[in-house]
């Protein structure tokens, strides 16, 4: 994040810089080359494939242009098109040509400047991208490596599995609403272990009635479950007797719930495996285990934070982290009009959501952060609304994490409470 201002970015493009605009595709990429003033060196877009041979050919083309036009630096720019740019970006970085990214929205808005035409094609887009790079309208991507690369991948897998589990749970809930709505009066959670044991053998009310109280109880005894017995079995039987669930399509209904339960259990096993790996990776990062000592902060928060942020040493201060999360304060003012100050919501959305969730956890479980939240919402000067205060608590946690990770200090509850009395703490918040 160092030297990340627009002036610094513009100054990085000198007379000796070869600027590349690359239109990234799933299988084929197109590139055009320019100098720092926008004069093109490539007669036509250079086409190369998303393969090792294609990358080598692209590198040879770049080196030929560098030598021919006496350039000593290459700045390749591209749009972050899904995941398609990852391999090309890593190849360029490994060959000492650090890629930069331009905002796709900026590309879309800028492509009419030259010809007043919104046409999108493989020749036009690389030129627009290169133009944005020359103007310093780019961002320097962070490509994690080592333990941070593993942690980000594992964290992404965790989020995907949790999303799949949520979808499966919703489908199971739908199944109950259709075939056995009374089940939810017996079990508050559809995934209760004793309930799932019964569902595997007797999913429909008529199946449960066939088993009877003794049959239901025997299933639990065979599974060595002691927390449930005939009293719970009787409640389940009574619910089945008075069920208003649909009796049509019973054969398919049994198959559907069996498949859903199998999917649910398999995803849970995978999630546990991923969480084991995540815990091992977090332990490899210096001071990361200290973050877990903060009451209300768990392994999911720490791993998610480190996966999104990566190496903390690349940031100069906590404000850069705040900006990355989209929690930077932005003001909407003009002339005598002074608008509301809000958060930017520009940055890594998953990091922002994670911080918001942990802020709610901290306010509920951590005395120091609860006191901070109370101060924000009840102070005499400029009290914050609850949602605004949670954003301020999230920003405070960023500062705490940053100091602990960069300076190697332990969490200090007394200092945390002492910070509340500082007048500079969020006079205005999102």
Placement of each model-derived feature along the sequence:
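A detector of single, family-specific signature residues
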Residues: 1-430
């Amino acid at each position: 994040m160092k030297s990340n201002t627009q002036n610094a970015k513009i100054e990085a493009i000198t007379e000796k810089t070869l600027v590349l605009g690359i239109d990234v595709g799933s299988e084929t990429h197109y590139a055009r080359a320019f100098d720092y003033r926008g004069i093109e060196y490539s007669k036509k877009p250079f086409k190369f494939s998303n393969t090792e041979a294609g990358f080598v050919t692209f590198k040879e083309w770049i080196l030929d242009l560098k030598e021919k036009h006496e350039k000593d630096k290459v700045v390749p720019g591209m749009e972050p098109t899904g995941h398609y740019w990852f391999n090309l970006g890593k190849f360029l970085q490994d060959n000492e040509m650090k890629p930069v990214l331009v905002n796709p929205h900026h590309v879309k808005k800028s492509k009419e400047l030259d010809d007043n035409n919104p046409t999108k094609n493989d020749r036009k887009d690389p030129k627009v991208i290169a133009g944005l790079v020359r103007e310093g309208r780019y961002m320097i991507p962070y490509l994690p490596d080592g333990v941070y690369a593993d942690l980000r991948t594992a964290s992404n897998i965790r989020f995907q599995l949790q999303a799949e589990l949520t979808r499966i749970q919703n489908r199971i809930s739908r199944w109950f609403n259709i075939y056995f709505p009374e089940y939810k009066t017996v079990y508050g959670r559809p995934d209760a272990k004793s309930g799932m044991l019964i569902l595997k053998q007797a999913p429909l009310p008529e199946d449960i009635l066939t088993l009877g109280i003794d049959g239901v109880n025997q299933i639990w005894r065979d599974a060595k479950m002691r927390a449930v017995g005939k009293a719970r079995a009787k409640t389940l039987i009574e619910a089945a007797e008075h069920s208003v669930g649909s009796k049509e399509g019973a054969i398919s209904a049994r198959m559907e719930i069996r498949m859903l339960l199998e999917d649910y259990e398999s995803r849970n096993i995978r999630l546990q495996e991923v969480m084991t790996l995540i815990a091992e990776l977090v332990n490899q990062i210096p001071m990361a285990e200290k973050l877990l000592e903060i009451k209300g902060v768990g392994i999911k928060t720490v791993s998610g934070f480190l996966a999104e942020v990566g190496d903390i040493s690349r940031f100069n201060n906590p404000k850069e982290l705040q900006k990355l999360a989209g929690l930077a304060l932005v003001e909407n003012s003009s002339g005598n009009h002074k608008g509301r100050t809000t958060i930017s919501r520009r940055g890594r959305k998953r990091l922002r959501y994670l911080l918001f969730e942990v802020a709610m956890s901290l306010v509920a479980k951590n005395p120091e952060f609860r006191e901070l939240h109370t101060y924000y919402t009840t102070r005499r000067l400029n009290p914050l609304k609850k949602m605004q205060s949670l954003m301020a608590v999230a920003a405070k946690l960023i500062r705490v994490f940053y100091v602990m990770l960069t300076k190697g200090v332990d969490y200090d509850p007394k200092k945390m409470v002492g910070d509340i009395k500082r007048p500079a703490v969020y006079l205005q918040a999102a």
